[in-house]
């Protein structure tokens, strides 16, 4: 669980932990041997697996220390004698999960500029917090108060730009 954007997610604490741990293990294993999705192929459904991690964390309103989980999972493979050949494993998984979070936010109708602003300060350890900030900002900007604030900002910015241009002449 979950296996898609609209499927059920685990809700009980042990189920949540088990689901996230299992999916982390899957991603570390495949990325560790350089079996990653390409732009056209994802034979092991790794995008769906990453989306499952993201949905489980966000919809249960939890922050996991995913960086620690990724490191620990990688060390478990090493301890069992498996040689993970991918030297950029942590970085690639961080970027992969970041891309999947962007996709998830887009599917939740969060504005592109808000997604980009959120992703610029993204941390795997605060995945839920990152999403929640973007979601709240999206709600504010899309209501009348946000529209008024944005309009006032644009007007003030335009006035300042004109003043700067006139003072340079």
Where are these regions (language model features)?
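Amphipathic alpha-helical "coupling" segments that flank catalytic cores
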Residues: 1-169
